[in-house]
Amino acid sequence: MRKVLFLLMGLPWLATAWGKDTTEVVVPFAYGNLDQWITREIHESAIIGGETKLLYEIGPTEKIVSNDAFTNKGGSPWANSNVMAKVAGVVKTNTSVYPEKRGDGMCARMETRFESVKVFGLLDIEVIAAGSIFLGQVHEPIKGTKNPQAMLQSGIEFTKRPKAIRFDYKTKLASSTNRVRSTGFSRKTTIPGRDSIAVILLLQKRWEDKEGNVYSKRVGTMVQRYIQSTDGWVNEATYPI
């Protein structure tokens, strides 16, 4: 199995500087230490095997046994790529983000992995599922593969002026020099070039005019890509915005 692992302690704070001095103010995100997780127990449809799957969400510690759509709990601003889909009445899940022990606390393990589904044990569909966490919400249940961005509400309101983002991380990338394309609707193909991992932060100023038109202007950007595995954890990595 081709797999890319990205172990991430969290995005627990933004480092900011105020005034003319260099005093650093650390502003944490709620649940950003990743020590609390919600476990969801989902029962998939019998037509695809009827398995019971676990999905994990960042938020106040709780276990939910239900196929109900999930919404953020306890004021958690976090969402991830663990989702429940319901297409033509068939319930299917994907789990590519997991809580994992790190020292006295927890971290998030994000995997890029193959997810397969068999219908009546005959039709085998395999797709690549990439693990990710982000600030915002997912509109469950997922009802199709068209326009995936419409299923996300990316970003949260942030009124401070951050100068940098800081987090701990650990990476393990696949050794292959090629990537695999597998959408489930066409044959699996190989694409030249190594895979990479990205952390992306966009700051936008948004406003609305009296006619109800919403505008946005980007005022800050941070993009960091990782193309090599790390030798253990990198602590307090700080990237300017």
Language-model segments: what does each one mean?
Residues W13, K163, T171:
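Functionally constrained cores in energy, signaling, and assembly domains
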Residues M1-V26:
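Bacterial Sec-dependent N-terminal signal peptides
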Residues K20-P162, R166, P192-R206, K210-I241:
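Aromatic (Trp/Tyr/Phe) and Gly/Pro-enriched flexible surface segments
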Residues S182-R187:
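Intrinsically disordered, low-complexity domain-flanking/linker segments in eukaryotic proteins
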Residues L14-T16, W78, L173, T177:
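Residue-level detector of intrinsically disordered, flexible termini
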Residues T177-R181, G212-N213:
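A short secondary-structure junction signal
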Residues T171-N178, T189-R194, W207-E208:
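Extended, low-complexity, turn-rich repeat/linker tracts enriched in Gly/Pro/Ser/Thr and Asp/Glu
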